[in-house]
Regions:
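A conserved alpha-helical element in kinase catalytic cores
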Residues: 48-100, 118, 123-127
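ATP/Mg2+ or Mg2+-diphosphate-binding catalytic cores
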Residues: 166-167, 287-340, 939
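Active-site activation/catalytic loop segments of kinase-like enzymes and analogous catalytic loops
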Residues: 234-267, 281-298
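Conserved N-terminal phosphate-binding loop of PLP-dependent enzymes in the Aspartate aminotransferase
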Residues: 568-993
């Protein structure tokens, strides 16, 4: 069949006029069809297959229809793939019969470029591929599998690997043939039994580089479902990984982003990761055998030879690679501890069960010591033998220590791959510096596993590795490097060693291949098939992995001062780590995240010490790292930190001081640790007092992350992922007089009437009404005039109490008053305080009336382990003192008015500024695309935040449409800081609108 024939068939059966171009394929005829009509889809793929494969084609169609239905029923953010869609014929059929015992299908063409169009791919693309396979597997896990579905003899089905062994002799190259035979045999004998214990599902099974469609850096589709099988999902990931490998020297490192990306879309289990490396090798071996089989049958089919040159090289590289190290790398990339036995080894050593001897100079605890800093930032540290000797003599030290996990600048030469992206610089042992000839002792009972003279420059020199076992027989090792050559003479493999036996002496510098006399002592939970060449220095970008393989040996040395330098990872590696060890429900600011390492006043500084004006973090109420607040915490922490079951003046004095800022009768204080806790306790107080549960809340409000508080936070329960409004909650429209339900001079009274209507509809006794005095997550909404006073009156008339959430806006931030509720001339029954109270330290409080506090005395003790501890109370008192004594409330009023006045002036020439609102330094600037329609400028707002970051200003946004700049800086901002913001805002809006 040629292109003209294909076009005629498409026109006849589908009524679509197209021009066709043939595409390569292994078993099918494929044509890319471009419509000559201006209506309908522009491009298609026409697939022609043998009628003998009808049952398999029907299965493929069922999968495609299922995926199309799945995509239409879930949020696009949960399934971002665009899979081909079946086109029905003029007779309503998705599968048509053709002459010569053939079947035809027409599918929509997925636009984009193929993975194979690019020779190399970056980490983002690899992660996107992994995510795509994971999303597809997650969707297909719900596909109902009928008996016999996609069940046929199929060489590409890993579960049928045994059938390939009889064809291995077709592989021409003898060396490749034996590697392939060994790989497939190991799969049959060791991997297939493990797969049989795993759940099976439909998998795509063909994520090769010609079946992956990309748009920019994102994989948007996996096409060609001709190889679908029912198997454990890890088999499909192995296929994609095999084709995704590009790094010839370190292929596994190159695909870690792919594995991590899959895990983030569809979390992998430990048993799946244990078989991934053998399955990758099996897929490559399978490809080599299948190519040999098919080439013998069709020697002219060039498609069959694609990737084979690459795979014959790759199978050799992977055959030489460590299965353990590859397994550990996959685990670490998915957030698991690299070596699954490392935890047991560490716990056994720390248990007190084994007898542990000092490695040098017993009793080591009493030996005079000093520490050397060889980190990359260290300058002038002694490194030569003479320098070290002088430094130790001057310090009166008999022993000098070089730390574990120290990122050093002393490793040079080919051994350390200095020109590689995985250059090794992080020390994995503890160095024990002492004169040559100093005795070295075995730390634990064991046997000699290995010994050698590693004589390459800056290597170990003479080295001994001892093998030990935990009580459960788990092996681990201790390594002693830089020894004297005579130390190796009496050794033999398997020689028994007892803890405390002298096993060596420290070598001279010439024996230690360039290092000053010392012993490198290392603890290892695996030798990862490296023997005496096991890394004593790790690449920084795989440090979490190597900390598992080679834990801190101080659990053996027991140096009270500690030995861990905690080498600092690069920002990109921290981002990767964060994705797998912290919940991805935690968001990050900015498209390209920034690592912040310190703060001072109104500024934050990144890892290159670049300053950023912080207009976002109202937590740092009196300025980042305020010296008075820091000092208060340090001094009290050095003295005492305990709980409130003991008398301590700090907690009592601070409670009195905090209550003195409140109007009567608010004078009873409860301490907690966060704003969420404060609001949860406020609910308990209200319920204890009213014996009711009904709640009134403002729309779009957020009051915290605790379950009870999510229930009264429409910002959470009414948005994506939320469970909807609970029965005991009624939502009042946000009293927004700019673009809300009611506007004008009487808007406040109309919103109060809305509250009355919700109250009447409640159908149960009212417990409380909770609100912020400026609604932050709604877009820094200043409540319409008169609303709050009228609302409080209605609530109290109904028997409820009024809760003022001051977590964000309290303690002088609103400028004209110390507390936000004072802006409205009301006095609440309960006040909750959070973010500003500790200037970054976790302290929060609830202040209420004696009457409500009395109602809480129901026989159940209130105790909060950390709430009101002396350190927190001392910090809180210092923050309050700074606010009052440095006039920060007045500064908030002055700077806030200056900022808002200037932005309002700016709005006269920049019509994207729809509204400027707030009080003091709690401000919202709403951006719109049209002043008349008030259409939210969501994209502009996001672009402006990125623009401002590049100009050294941190901004963020809020509101239902994410189009309101929220401005809530530390109260210490100065006019020059505001001027910087105004300049950036003007430039950004001018450039971006």
């Amino acid at each position: 069949m040629n292109s003209v024939d294909a076009a005629e068939l498409v026109l006849t059966h589908y009524g679509i006029s197209v021009t066709c171009t043939p595409l390569a394929g292994e078993r099918d005829l494929n044509f890319r069809c471009v419509s000559t009509s201006s209506t309908g889809d522009a491009e298609y793929i026409f697939k022609v297959q043998s009628i003998t494969e009808k049952s398999l084609i029907v299965a493929q169609n069922q999968v495609l229809e299922f995926l199309h239905e799945h995509a239409s029923n879930v949020d696009r953010r949960d399934f971002s793939l665009t899979e081909p869609k079946l086109v029905t014929s003029v007779n309503g059929e998705s599968l048509i019969e053709l002459p010569d015992h053939r079947l035809g299908r027409l599918l929509t063409w997925v636009p984009g470029t193929l993975w194979s169009d690019e020779s190399t791919h970056n980490e983002k693309q690899l992660a996107s591929l992994g995510k795509a396979v994971g999303l597809l597997d997650s969707a297909l896990s719900k596909f109902p599998i009928s008996d016999g579905f996609a069940n046929h003899d199929f060489g590409w089905n890993v579960l049928q690997t045994a059938n390939l062994l009889s064809h291995v002799d077709l592989v021409a190259d003898e060396n490749i043939r034996e590697i392939v035979r060994r790989t497939l045999s190991e799969c049959v004998d060791m991997i297939l039994p493990k797969l049989s214990q795993m759940p099976s599902q439909v998998i795509h099974n063909d994520g090769n580089d010609n079946n992956v469609v990309m748009v920019a850096d994102n994989v948007v589709s996996l096409i060609d479902f001709g190889d679908i099988i029912v198997a454990p999902r890890i088999c499909g990931l192995a296929v994609a990984a095999a084709y995704g490998i590009e790094h010839e020297n370190d292929p596994i490192f190159g695909i870690l982003p792919l594995v991590s990306g899959y895990h983030q879309a569809s979390p992998l289990q430990a048993d799946e990761l244990a078989v991934l490396f053998p399955l990758i090798k099996t897929r490559i071996a399978t490809s080599i055998v299948m190519a040999a089989i098919q080439s013998a049958a069709s020697p002219d089919n060039e498609y069959l030879l694609i990737s084979q040159e690459k795979f014959t090289k790759l199978i050799q590289t992977l055959d030489a690679a460590s299965n353990d190290l590859s397994h550990f790398r996959f685990r670490s990339a998915c957030g698991y501890e690299g070596n699954p036995t490392s935890r047991e080894v560490r716990h056994w050593i720390q248990s007190g069960i084994p007898r542990i001897a000092d490695v040098v100079m017993p009793p080591l605890a009493d030996t005079p010591k000093m520490w050397f800093d060889w980190s990359i930032t260290s300058q002038g540290a002694p490194k030569t033998s003479d320098e070290i000797t002088v430094a130790m003599r001057n310090a009166g030290a008999a022993l000098a220590i070089g730390n574990f996990c120290e990122n050093r600048n002393v490793y040079e030469g080919d051994n350390y791959e200095v020109a590689s992206a995985t250059r090794r610089t992080v020390h994995l042992g503890v160095d024990l510096f002492a004169p040559a000839g100093t005795s070295v002792y075995a730390a634990l009972d064991g046997v000699v596993e290995l010994f050698n003279d590693n004589f390459a420059p800056l290597d170990y020199g003479p080295v001994i590795v001892l093998r030990h076992e935990t009580g459960n027989g788990i092996p681990f090792w201790t390594l002693y490097g830089h020894l004297s050559r005579p130390s190796l003479v009496p050794l033999y493999i398997g020689k028994p060693i007892s803890a405390g036996d002298e096993i060596a002496t420290m070598g001279e510098e010439f024996e230690n291949v360039g290092w000053a006399p010392h012993t490198h002592f290392q603890l290892l939970t695996s030798l990862v098939d490296m023997g005496v060449d096991v890394y004593g220095v790790a690449p920084l970008n795989e440090l979490p992995l190597w900390r598992s393989i080679s834990p801190n040996p101080n659990i053996v040395l027991r140096l009270a001062e500690g030995t861990d330098s905690h080498a600092h990872l690069a920002t990109s590696d921290l981002v990767a780590e964060r994705k797998v060890v912290l919940s991805r429900a935690l968001s990050l600011n900015f498209r390209d995240p920034i690592e912040i390492v310190r703060g001072s006043g109104a500024y934050l500084y990144d890892d290159s010490d670049r300053p950023f004006l912080d207009l976002v973090n109202n937590v740092a109420h009196v300025g980042h790292s305020h010296p008075r607040v820091v000092r208060a915490g340090q001094e009290q922490m050095a003295l005492l930190n305990t709980n409130t079951r003991y008398i301590n003046q700090h907690a009592i004095e601070f409670a009195r001081a905090l209550a003195s800022t409140m109007p009567d009768p608010l004078n009873v204080v409860f301490y907690v640790n966060s704003g969420s806790e404060a609001n949860d306790l406020a609910l308990r107080l209200a319920r204890a007092h009213t014996h009711a549960r009904g709640m009134l809340v403002l729309d779009h409000a957020y009051h915290g992350h605790i379950t009870s508080i999510i229930d009264i936070s429409p910002y959470k329960f009414a948005r994506r992922g939320g469970a909807g409004r609970p029965d005991h909650v009624r939502v009042v429209p946000t009293p927004d007089s700019y673009k809300g339900l009611h506007r004008g001079l009487d808007a406040g009274l109309k919103y109060a009437a809305e509250l009355d209507a919700q109250l009447a509809d409640m159908g149960m006794p009212l417990c409380a009404f909770i609100s912020e005095s400026i609604v932050s997550t709604a877009g820094q909404i200043t409540l319409a005039d008169g609303f709050l006073a009228r609302a409080y009156a209605s609530v109290r008339a109904a028997g409820g109490v009024c809760i003022a959430d001051e977590v964000q806006i309290g303690m002088g931030r609103v400028g004209d008053h110390f507390w936000g509720f004072e802006l409205h001339g009301v006095v609440p029954d309960i006040v909750t305080i959070g973010k500003p109270l500790g200037n970054g330290h976790p302290i929060a409080a609830v202040v209420t009336t004696p009457e409500i506090a009395q109602s809480f005395l129901n026989g159940m003790e209130y105790f909060n382990t950390f709430g009101g501890n002396p350190v927190s109370a001392a910090i809180g008192q210092a923050v309050l003192d700074v606010v009052v004594e440095q006039g920060l409330q007045a500064n908030a009023r002055t700077m806030g008015n200056y900022l808002m006045d200037n932005v309002r002036t700016m709005s006269q020439s920049l019509d994207v500024i729809g509204d400027v609102r707030g009080s003091g330094l709690f401000i919202g600037v709403e951006l719109v695309t049209d002043l008349a329609t008030q259409t939210p400028a969501t994209q502009l707002t996001d672009d402006l935040i990125q623009f401002a970051k590049e100009r050294g200003v941190f901004l963020s946004c809020d509101g239902p449409d994410n189009n309101v700049l929220k401005i809530k800086p530390p109260l210490v901002v100065e006019q020059s800081d505001i001027d910087l913001f105004l300049s950036v805002l003007s430039d950004g809006l001018t450039a971006l609108r």
